[in-house]
Amino acid sequence: MSTVPTLPGITSQMVQTDRLNVHVLSCGPEEGTAVLFVHGNVSSATYWEETMLALPDGYRGLAVDLRGYGDTEALPINGATGMADFAADVRSVVETLGVGKHHIVGHSMGGGVVMLYAINHAADLLSITLVDPVSPYGYGGSKGANGAMVYDDGAPSGINPEFVTLLASGERGLENPMSPRNVLRGFYVKPPFIPAREDALVESMLTTKIGDDHYPGNAVPSTNWPGAAPGDKGVLPAFNRKYFDASGLANIDPKPPILWVRGADDLIVSDYAMFDLAALGHMGAVPGWPGDEECPPQPMLAQTRAVLDNFTANGGSYQEVVIEDAGHSPYLEKPAAFNAAFHKHLNG
């Protein structure tokens, strides 16, 4: 049923909810305590399989494909509500399957989805795990630890168009530096690490639906640097600061414990991220950058830490675990170190 071959022990199924038809991977006993996994951008549930299979006894792993990724029904992604729609889609799976209280885990963009899910469904959560998550103020368009907008239209926003073209064409090779496989090797993980299931992970990336309604979404001309702002459709607008703000995570009640795990050498989510146009402008890779005062690199880690510190000030608790010599996907790169922290968190 899964486009990408699954590991032994992983079950693939389609779950028709009242919102859409969702592809779900699962493992473990049906009566086990559920652990719900949400993948990041340009990937799918495939990325979680090893982590699911490594769950301690008594846990049931469930990983969803978000709309526009993997084998889930590719409903359009609305720029203004896209992240909330992802969270509502995930919730519809929980309700359709009759999942009781559960743990939830989100990677990268999926971390932002989990934040919104927690804001709406905190009482059902046993714990929250954020793995190299997008900032609570999104990716692009914000500055400062408090997530203030850089410009009122969401600029700067954008992605390398060559990567999008190569994704759309199904490129699997290494010839082009922006090929999906090279982006996986250079940014999803820290070189020289190469995942054992690299071919499956590349196939997962290639399930991403391409276009204005999906990835990367549309953009509109802007008088602000670099001349483009997020439009009203697709993924990049959905997680831009213009439309995304999950800082309300600090105020949820009740407050399940939060584990924030990140790779020490993550190039995708950091305070100087390689896909942040402001950082690229600062280093001279995008011309015309207006300077630090107007458009500084987005301090993604500082923003996340500020919201989690507010969560603590409001009576919650979180732990930040930094995994050395790992990039954006420590659960793939350093599974023993990741699972040690993750399983301890699950077991309370």
Residue ranges and their predicted role:
Residues 1-35, 56-59, 99-100, 154-158, ...:
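Alpha/beta-hydrolase fold catalytic core
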Residues 17-18, 63-109, 119-120, 135, ...:
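Active-site loop/oxyanion-hole signature of alpha/beta-hydrolase fold enzymes
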Residues 20-79, 93:
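Conserved HGGG/HGGXW glycine-rich cap/lid loop of the alpha/beta-hydrolase fold
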Residues 36-40, 107, 262:
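The conserved beta1-alpha1 loop
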Residues 111-122, 128:
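Short glycine-enriched nucleophile-adjacent loop
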Residues 129-139:
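Active-site nucleophile loop of the alpha/beta-hydrolase fold
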Residues 148-303:
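Alpha/beta-hydrolase
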Residues 287-295, 326-335:
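Catalytic histidine-centered segment of alpha/beta-hydrolase-like enzymes
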